[in-house]
Amino acid sequence: MRPNGARTQTAPPPAAAEGTADVHGNGEAATIQLDGQPSAPSPPLTTVFEATDDYKARRRNLESEPPFEVRAILDDELSDYPVAAPLDAVPQKHSCCCGVCLRRCAFVLTGMAVGMLLAAALLATIAAFAVPESVWTGGVCERGWVQHMGVCYKPGRTPPPSSAADGNFSAATFAGANTNCAAAGGSIVSSDQALSFLVLLSKTASGPNSAPPRGSWWTTHSGSCAIVHYAPSSTLEVYGNTSSLQSLALRTRDALDVSIAEDTQCSGSAGVMCAAAPAPPTALKYAQALRAILTLGVRAE
C-alpha cells in the first residue's frame, strides 16, 4: 500500500543497443538495427538527376526561341505573299509574243463570222419558204419616191409657171424628161398613171403652203409622147349654220382639163414625172434568189 500523496516513478525502458556503420560508402552514417530492436527513423534520401547533353541542348533551344505569338507574327511577315508593286517595277508580259495572240484573235473572229453566215443562211432559208407569195410581187419605194396604187412616183422637175394669166408651164423637152427619169431610176409615166397620181397630190395639197399640182406633164400614151394638162379647181361650200366656224367645210372638186395632146414630133416643154416599180428589200431579194435555187434543186431531183 502506498500512502496518500506518494508518487510512483516508472523507469524508462532500457535503450536499445544501436550501432552505426558507413553503409552507403559516401561517408554518411546509417542506423543499423541490432538485436531485432526497432531503430530510429533515418533522414529522407535526396535523389539527384544529372541532365544529359541532349536534354541541355533542347532546353537551351527552347529558352532561346521567342513565344508562339511572336513566332506567328514573324512567320507572317516573312511569308511569300504577293505584294502590290508599282507598274514600273513589274515586268510586263507580252502575251502577243510570236503572234500567238494574233492567231488566237483571228481564230475567234473567223469562228464568229462563220457562225453569223450560217445563221443568216438558216434565216434566209426559212424566209424563202415562210414568206407568202404576195410579198414577192410587192416592195417598198426608195427614199424620195411616193408610193401610190402599187407604183412609185417622183416628180423629176416641177413645171414652173411661165405666165400667171394663162397658167402655162415649161420645164423640159420629152428627151430631157426621159433623161431625168432614167437618172432617177424610173421612166416617164403613162397618161393613166399621171392622172391617178395628180389626183392624189391634189387631194393631199390641203395645207396653206401647198398647192395642187397644176400644169402640163409629159406622159406616154398609145406608144407615143403626150402631154397631160391638169387644172383642178376648188369650191367653198357652206353646210348648216353659217354663224358657226365649225360648220364650214372646204371641199375640193377636181375639174380635170385633161388634154392628152399627142405630138408626133414630141416638141415643146412640160413637167417631168417618173414612175418605177417598188423593189423588194435586199434581204427579200436574197431570200427570193435562194428560194429559186432550192426550188430548181428540188425539181432537178
Swiss-Prot record:
Membrane topology: Single-pass type II membrane protein
Residue numbers on the Virion surface membrane side: 132-301
Keywords, sorted A to Z: Membrane, Signal-anchor, Transmembrane, Transmembrane helix, Viral envelope protein, Virion
Lineage, opening ranks: Viruses, Duplodnaviria, Heunggongvirae, Peploviricota, Herviviricetes
Function as written in the Swiss-Prot or TrEMBL entry: Seems to be required for glycoprotein B-induced fusion.
One Gene Ontology CC term in the entry: membrane
Domain of life per record: Viruses
InterPro entries with a match to the protein in the record: CTDL_fold
Any Pfam family: UL45
Protein family according to the UniProt entry: Belongs to the herpesviridae HHV-1 UL45 family.
Low complexity bias locations: 1-20
Region listing for Disordered, in residue ranges: 1-27
Subcellular location: Virion membrane
TM regions (residue ranges): 111-131
Name of the protein in its database record: Envelope protein UL45
Intravirion side: 1-110
Organism: Psittacid herpesvirus 1 (isolate Amazon parrot/-/97-0001/1997) (PsHV-1)
